[in-house]
Amino acid sequence: MKTSMPRALLALFCLLASLAHAAPNSILHRPYDLDTGHGVLRGSLLLPRSAVPPPVVLLVAGSGPTDRDGNNPFGGNNRYLLRLAEALAERGIASVRYDKRGVARSLAAAPREEDLSVGVYVDDVVAWSERLARDPRFSRLILVGHSEGALIASLAAPRTPAEELIAIAGSGQPIDRVLREQLRGRLPPAQLRQADSVLASLKAGETRGDIPPALANLLRPSVQPYLISLFREDPARAFGRLRIPTLIVQGRNDIQVGVADAEALQRAKPDSQLVLIDGMNHILRIAPSTGLQQLSAYNDPNLPLARQLVEAVSRFILRGAEAEKAAEPLQKSLPAPTSSESRPVKAAGQRMSDDR
């Protein structure tokens, strides 16, 4: 008996050690790049080990030079997209996130900012989606867009094999209106009038060269072609055109996009699920609505994501996977339609071969 106890403790220690090492090794981290034919986009894949192909999420980042992890030289180092990808992988959901054209390691794909447009970003999402749909390691594709990425994903979705779309902190109103609201409380009256004049010109499709130094970072001439393309779009209208299941997630302490935006998206597509999260800010952390803690969250990559966000997103994706699995035996048991019968209705979340 005296020798069995140390052996038992040793066996327990070895078991715990093996479990500690098993969790990270159960998720593959791999580069995942896309050659678009006019530039290579660099990305990262998180793939949980699974006996069956898991669903895969394509994460579409927000505005400006936001990289694949969610970091932005103007918006902070907080890695919100990386943290979301990790949380989804722990729940059996694969993901690909990427540096946008002209950003970080995809800079060479668009070295000139003047060459960027919403249409270019939409085409890139379509190309990524087509590659993921061809990859046999994945069962189904879900687009997840954050902030401006929700608009880009909404515009791209009808051209992709995506079966669901999730909009996180996505605007529900035209972006020029959003910029005006954001500037209204931050600029003195004279500068605000100048900004309104420039925004009106861009909305009309006209570039401006007379940008005051105080506004140069936001409205510099090199970014104006992109803003002109962005101001043409209506996020709610684009979202309302979608014919796939959709989830809207919005934090109540978001100082950049408000609950009214999420409600506008739901009005545009009433069958969408809407989840409002108390305390969550724009970068998906729990933070006060004002003060230093709200701002400091933008530069703290170690803050955990809002738990309700991860639960809502993963539940929506996994329920879609279960619905697809449940529909398969039913479709297989149906008799083949005769020429006089109508084509079987496509089950929610299920792709039929004719639709590809």
Regions found by a protein language model. Give the residues of each.
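N-terminal cap/lid segment of alpha/beta-hydrolase-fold proteins
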Residues: 23-52
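Short, surface-exposed "cap/lid" segments of acyl-processing enzymes
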Residues: 51-53, 57-88
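Alpha/beta-hydrolase active-site loop
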Residues: 80, 113-134
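Conserved alpha/beta-hydrolase
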Residues: 80-107
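Primarily recognizes the serine-hydrolase "nucleophile elbow" in alpha/beta-hydrolase
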Residues: 130-187
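Accessory cap/linker subdomain of secreted extracellular hydrolases
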Residues: 166-237
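Short beta-strand/loop motif that positions the catalytic acidic residue
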Residues: 242, 248-250
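Catalytic active-site module of serine/aspartate enzymes centered on a nucleophile-bearing elbow/loop
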Residues: 283, 289-334
